[in-house]
Amino acid sequence: MTNGYFIDSHAHLYREYYPDDFREVIERAIEHRVEKVVLPCVSAESLPDIFEVTLQFPKNLFPLIGLHPTDVNQDYKSQLAVLEKHLSNKNVVGIGETGIDLYHDKTFYKEQFDAFEVQLNWATETCLPLSIHIRDGFNEALSVLKKFKSAQLRGILHCFSGGIQEAKWAIDNGFLLGISGVVTFKKNKLQDIVKEVGISAIALETDAPFLAPDPYRGKRNESAYIPIIAEKIAEVLEISAEEVMRITTENVERIFNL
């Protein structure tokens, strides 16, 4: 490859997940030309860790502020109040991860919708981009997003798992599709989505420490594996890995103003 670098648009690089080798994980990412990583926030409790590591690596790690849908519980309003206070932090590049997750637990179904709307309002007020998590709830999430159509939201549908209709709606409404290591797995539909939408609609992500690509499937994931995802996308689209790197980096820098 020529000069240039990758961006991992979604990775949970917290010390909680890498207690023994955090610095080495960052160094390995940089060695593999993954020079920028966007760090989603999942709850108020994750803020100290996120801000600590982003201060350590200010040129490489870029924090978001948000409440993950599976972290929505009976005290979600107080969590949102704490998170909202940090929106003005000059290092924060976006909001997320927020969204709808009906796969794990529907106990706080209504609260998830309310928390999602609150964070979409933050995006409207601050003009910050979004990292959106949707699992088993595309129709529900899109019904909320459509209320904000006039707000001209932008962002990434992280770890995209929808069909082609959802993909086209997202792209038409200012969102990139976050493509993770799942694209390297055998018998997955994500490769068909990638073929259909093309490289201009794609952001690379690991979702580390989860969803490691083949041949590391089932093991701890890290940002250094982004080139593996890029190689698979290059193969699917019949373009060079250099082009995947260049265009996806431009895509993510445009969305998050990195």
PLM feature spans:
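Mid-domain alpha/beta scaffold segments of enzyme catalytic cores
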Residues: 1-258
